[in-house]
From Swiss-Prot:
Belongs to the FET4 family. Induction: By iron deprivation. The keyword S-adenosyl-L-methionine does not apply. This is Low-affinity Fe(2+) transport protein. It comes from the Eukaryota. GO terms for molecular function: copper ion transmembrane transporter activity; iron ion transmembrane transporter activity. It comes from Saccharomyces cerevisiae (strain ATCC 204508 / S288c). Keywords: Ion transport, Iron, Iron transport, Isopeptide bond, Membrane, Phosphoprotein, Transmembrane, Transmembrane helix, Transport, Ubl conjugation.
């Protein structure tokens, strides 16, 4: 690893992940009461920590009682520094209810001001600039949230695989004292597992605790639907048609005519016409990014709560097995989760994604905003100055939208493969032990075969290829050339802004839909994993009862 790359945060690197599950500490169980009083196990709440004595190359993962996940290394393989921890904190803040309500308050105030002052030009520019800056910051947080969430889930799978390998090693040993018939998990015991899980959770639905949750669920479902995409493009084509209607050209008298001459009063496809769609899309982007960040936070909280219980059961299983075999010394095996091979193009995309999602992107953003403020006085704070920051963040946000979608498509596939591997290993162990597992606990999401779903899947695949990122770069270069030809006038900047904002909003709808599908699949997998751990815990409790543990 080069010193320069390490200084910059090692952008683009995707090293293999090595992890060893910690060995259960018998003292933290027995300190709750007499070591022979196994009923006390039910009240134990374990905060799971990785074994700090492992080699430096191992990545540690810690899960708190609230479900928050913390890792010792980031997704590029480097230990987390102050900047990484700060960005992770901002990701959590951005998805909070407080930020959600603040955004809506700002939006309402902006609407009221527009009504009072009859929606002047600068009023629209303020919304576009504000939204562009917000979108620029949110893209950084969304990218980091995607990359860190997947890195955390891969480490979770590594923890589960490491312990599962030990479980398989211990449980498949046969001893003369054991009677497999006595530890068979009955059908009614398996059915009782469902009593511990909300039926909606088994289907991957987020729990609804209040009106806010209900609003978020409905909004994400409709904004990320194929119908919303169709309505969006209908609105765009209607707007294009309205461009043929002459509108205020923004010129000052004397006019050369109503629609003729070099200084007409009215003009087709005017700057005002472009401003209308820019403002409308800016509001839509503001709402969508806020909902997306919030939905991701709620999803992480949901899965985190299940993972706390899953790790607790893993600890209990590990304790009972090791107590039976009187072995608290043998460590769990090290599990290596290999990174997927990438083409040169995808490595470049990952490099850019890491620039967005690390401190480098923040530093670049601060430098750009400082420069923009600095040139305000020489430009006399005119309309062009107001538009400059919106144009920059709009073009960058346009590229970010393509990169976000392409990266998300790949990391979800990698994440799903690891959860699928855990489910496969679980079921193989169940088969060896003669444990029956209901089909609904296999971790497979309900199949959807509607026309709308297939259409949406096709759109998602098209929008998630490296070629789509290349096309976005070509479009940006073309728009920069056009704006330069117009000397970055108001019209030139609006031309650079308008198509990028439209496509960025469309990609955000596609991304929102992709998040809905992937998050639902993950919730199905996590709840199924929870159910399988309860079944395995029941098996272990029957196979190694208290009397047998006392005798040994």
């Amino acid at each position: 690893m080069g010193k320069i790359a390490e200084f910059l945060g090692n952008p683009g690197a995707r090293p293999d992940v090595h992890h060893r599950a910690p060995t259960v500490d018998c003292k933290q169980y027995e300190e709750f009461g007499d070591s022979n009083d196994y009923k006390n196990d039910d009240v134990v709440r374990v905060v799971s920590h990785s074994d700090e004595s492992t080699d430096d190359e191992l990545c540690n993962v810690n899960l708190t009682e609230t479900g928050a996940i913390f890792t010792s290394k980031g997704f590029t393989g480097l230990s987390k520094g102050f900047t990484d921890k700060t960005l992770d904190f901002l990701v959590r803040v951005a998805g909070s209810q407080a930020v959600f309500f603040i955004v809506w308050i700002i939006l309402i105030i902006w609407v009221v001001i527009g009504i009072v002052y009859n929606a002047p030009f600068n009023w629209q520019v303020v919304m576009q600039d504000g939204q562009s800056i917000q979108s620029y910051v949110w893209d950084t947080l969304l990218m980091r949230q995607q990359l860190m969430s997947t890195h955390e889930q891969i480490l979770i799978c590594g923890r589960l695989k490491s312990r599962l390998a030990s479980f398989k090693n211990y449980l498949t040993r046969s001893t003369p004292e054991e009677e497999k018939a006595d530890c068979t998990v009955e059908a009614n015991e398996v059915s009782s597992v469902e009593n511990h899980i909300d039926p909606s959770a088994i289907n991957g639905e987020l729990p609804v605790e209040n009106w806010y949750d209900r609003l978020s669920n409905v909004a994400s479902r409709y904004m990320g639907s194929i119908a919303a995409m169709v309505i969006f493009w209908i609105g765009i084509f209607v707007w294009i048609g309205c461009g043929a209607i002459p509108k205020d050209a923004g010129n000052t008298p004397p006019y050369t005519g109503e629609t003729t001459g070099s200084n007409p009063r009215l003009k087709k496809f005017s700057d005002a016409w472009q401003m209308y769609i820019n403002t409308a899309v800016a509001v839509s982007l503001l709402i969508c990014t806020t909902f997306l960040q919030n939905i991701r936070a709620r999803h992480d909280y949901f899965t985190g709560r299940f993972l706390v219980d899953i790790f607790d059961m893993d600890e209990k299983i590990d304790y009972r097995i090791r107590k039976h075999f009187n072995d608290f010394e043998t460590p769990h095996p090290v599990v290596t989760i290999e990174s997927k091979k990438r083409s040169t193009g995808r490595k470049m995309i990952d490099w850019y994604a890491d620039i967005i999602g690390t401190g480098i992107g923040v530093l670049i953003g601060v430098a750009v905003f400082a420069t923009w403020i600095g040139i305000g006085s020489p430009m006399k704070w005119d309309d062009n100055w107001w538009l400059i920051i919106g144009t920059y963040t709009g073009l960058i946000g346009f590229l970010d939208g393509f990169v976000l979608r392409e990266v998300y498509f790949r990391i979800v596939q990698h994440e799903e493969k690891n959860y699928s591997d855990v489910a496969k290993e679980d079921l193989e162990l169940f088969q060896e032990l003669g444990i029956e597992c209901p089909e609904e606990f296999s971790g497979k999401a309900p199949e959807i075969n509607t026309i709308g779903y297939r259409t949406s899947q096709y759109i998602n695949r098209i929008c998630s290829t490296p070629w789509s990122v290349l096309v976005s770069v070509i479009i940006i270069i073309g728009l920069i050339c056009i704006a330069s030809g117009l000397r970055w006038s108001t019209t030139g900047q609006l031309i650079a802004n308008t198509p990028t904002m439209i496509i960025e909003e469309f990609f955000l709808l596609v991304l929102l839909q992709a998040h809905n599908w992937a998050d639902r699949q993950r919730r199905v997998e996590v709840t199924a994993l929870y159910a399988r751990r309860r079944i395995l815990l029941s098996y272990v409790e029957k196979r190694f009862p208290e009397v047998m543990m006392l005798e040994k």
